[in-house]
Amino acid sequence: MKDPRDIIKRPIITENTMNLTAQKKYTFEVDVKANKTEVKEAVEKIFGVKVEKVNIMNYKGKFKRVGRYSGYTNRRRKAIVTLTPDSKDIELFEV
């Protein structure tokens, strides 16, 4: 099994994701090869909370050009983690 800190890259903190924290939903950028089970176990191990479900979205890389050079940006994977109602909040997202 992979190290949990390799699976969870960083939290995604935007206005929309901060509104979701009221519903106990937290958003993270995760490794593109990680599946829902690995994300669930990593969040439970790192933050000490109970996860109810995990939703995952994939983003393909955007096409970019710089002068005569062209290529794609890195693809990304975003996970929205829903905690159980009796679980404590993740302090990382506190204002």
From Swiss-Prot:
Gene3D superfamilies: 3.30.70.330
Assembly and interaction partners: Part of the 50S ribosomal subunit. Contacts protein L29, and trigger factor when it is bound to the ribosome.
Superkingdom assignment: Bacteria
Cited PROSITE patterns: RIBOSOMAL_L23
UniProt KW Ribosomal protein keyword: yes
Coiled-coil annotated spans: none
Database matches in Pfam families: Ribosomal_L23 (PF00276)
Family: Belongs to the universal ribosomal protein uL23 family.
Keywords assigned: Ribonucleoprotein, Ribosomal protein, RNA-binding, rRNA-binding
The protein's role, per its UniProt record: One of the early assembly proteins it binds 23S rRNA. One of the proteins that surrounds the polypeptide exit tunnel on the outside of the ribosome. Forms the main docking site for trigger factor binding to the ribosome.
GO molecular function: rRNA binding; structural constituent of ribosome
Organism of this sequence: Geobacillus sp. (strain WCH70)
GO cellular component, one term: ribonucleoprotein complex
Segment forming the signal sequence: none
Any GO BP: translation
Protein name according to UniProt: Large ribosomal subunit protein uL23
